[in-house]
């Protein structure tokens, strides 16, 4: 715990008041003025605005968010009667990675999701430890519910953590009776979904227009898949889109090879021509074409998905995938009302240099963490430990 406390203080000293990209500033702007301008999660904007109400900027938010994460790691020692001497060096090694030393200072919804997921699952583990004590059990379960519900609302795929938590809850509560386990698991999952939906509803600005975040996100995925399809296989025809707008579809087909990359979806945003053409084609036509790709050209669809996930899971050149973000950068009209200014100072340069030491090491390999998780899960199951 001492190592983690020292790590938290070192991280805060190196990163406060935090690192903000355009998305960070845009959501802080929404939270400060209680408006909706982007399709980012309303709950995250509200959280940033809430902490900004106490101390201007993101210093307090970063501190609380990081304290949640480091506190959750420290709480793991309470799950066993005694802690191995290995805990201190392992904790020190973890603290030195960019994921803990730098990422905790980045004001991104992804980091909040990760911290909430870890905190929620640690609460669930403590609930298992004190299960016979109903009062303490429900306190831990309430903490898990709040954190997992919040996490599910700030990241598009955040609900996955809730699914895994529901499986764990069912296992813990079953006590050898599978029907009881299913009831607890389903009940826990429904509670997270309901609580998360309530959080988002309450965080919505009172006079904001109808939220289009989900539909906008789906449309972006549709565009990305279709552009990828015509890039990987020029023979694939966009007939359904062409029937709705032949001129726009022609531009899309011409520009797709230059704008598609499995690395990031952002490249499409840099080409005004293809952006305008995509906007000209109706949602109905694009969706019909997307269904055609998925169900009538499934092999090509899977090729597109494979290319995307190849860069997600095992990027050939990690430097191209924004492995770290430092400083503050956003349009001046968004930063000025928040009393923010562009920042990339010497300390940011040094942190960036520090992060690059890890780029081509196992620290940035997803496979390492999958392997560690699998080994630990197998060990705990073999030892019959929660």
What annotation goes with each model-predicted range?
Residues 15-27, 35-47, 55-59, 282, ...:
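Extracytoplasmic catalytic/substrate-binding loops of multi-pass membrane glycan-assembly enzymes
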Residues 56-60, 307-386:
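Membrane-interface anchor segments at the N-terminal boundary of transmembrane helices
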Residues 9, 140-155, 166, 188-192:
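Membrane-interface alpha helices of multi-pass inner-membrane proteins
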Residues 32, 75, 113-132, 146-148, ...:
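Specific aromatic-rich, kink-prone transmembrane helix
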Residues 207-340:
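Membrane-proximal stem/loop segments at transmembrane-domain junctions that anchor or position
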Residues 22, 105-112, 154:
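Short acidic/glycine- and proline-prone juxtamembrane loop motifs at membrane-interface regions
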Residues 63-82, 119, 123:
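Transmembrane-helix motifs of polytopic, lipid-linked glycan transferases
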Residues 42-46, 54-71, 88, 103:
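Loop-to-helix entry region of an early transmembrane alpha helix in multi-pass inner-membrane enzymes
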């Amino acid at each position: 715990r001492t190592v983690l406390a020292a790590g938290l203080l070192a991280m805060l000293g190196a990163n406060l008041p935090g690192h903000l990209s355009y998305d960070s500033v845009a959501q802080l702007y929404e939270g400060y003025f209680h408006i909706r301008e982007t399709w980012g999660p309303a709950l995250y904007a509200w959280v940033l605005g809430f902490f900004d109400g106490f101390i201007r900027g993101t210093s307090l938010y970063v501190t609380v968010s990081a304290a949640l994460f480091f506190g959750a790691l420290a709480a793991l020692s309470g799950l066993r009667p005694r802690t191995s001497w290995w805990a201190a060096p392992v904790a020190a090694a973890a603290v030195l990675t960019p994921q803990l030393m730098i990422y905790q200072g980045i004001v991104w919804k992804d980091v909040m999701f990760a911290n909430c997921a870890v905190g929620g699952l640690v609460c669930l583990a403590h609930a298992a430890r004190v299960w016979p004590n109903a009062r303490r059990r429900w306190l831990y379960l309430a903490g898990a519910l709040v954190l997992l519900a919040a996490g599910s609302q700030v990241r598009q795929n955040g609900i996955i953590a809730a699914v895994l938590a529901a499986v764990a809850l069912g296992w813990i509560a079953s006590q050898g009776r599978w029907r009881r386990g299913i009831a607890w698991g389903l009940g826990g999952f429904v509670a997270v979904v309901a609580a998360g939906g309530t959080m988002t509803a309450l965080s919505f600005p009172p006079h904001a227009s109808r939220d289009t975040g989900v539909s906008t996100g789906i449309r972006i995925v549709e565009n990305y898949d279709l552009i990828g399809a015509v890039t990987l296989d020029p023979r694939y025809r966009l007939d359904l889109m062409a029937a709705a707008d032949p001129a726009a579809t022609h531009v899309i087909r011409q520009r797709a090879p230059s704008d598609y990359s499995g690395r990031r979806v952002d490249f499409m945003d840099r080409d005004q021509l293809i952006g305008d053409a995509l906007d000209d084609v109706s949602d109905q036509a694009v969706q019909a074409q997307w269904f055609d790709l998925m169900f009538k050209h499934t092999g090509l669809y899977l090729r597109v998905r494979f290319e995307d996930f190849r860069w997600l899971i095992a990027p050939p050149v990690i430097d191209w995938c924004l492995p770290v973000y430092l400083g503050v950068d956003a349009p001046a009209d968004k930063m000025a009302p928040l009393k923010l200014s562009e920042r990339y100072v010497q300390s940011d340069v040094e942190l960036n240099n520090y992060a690059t030491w890890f780029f081509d090491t196992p620290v940035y390999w997803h496979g390492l963490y999958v392997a560690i998780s699998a080994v630990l899960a197998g060990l705990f199951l073999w030892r019959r430990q929660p």
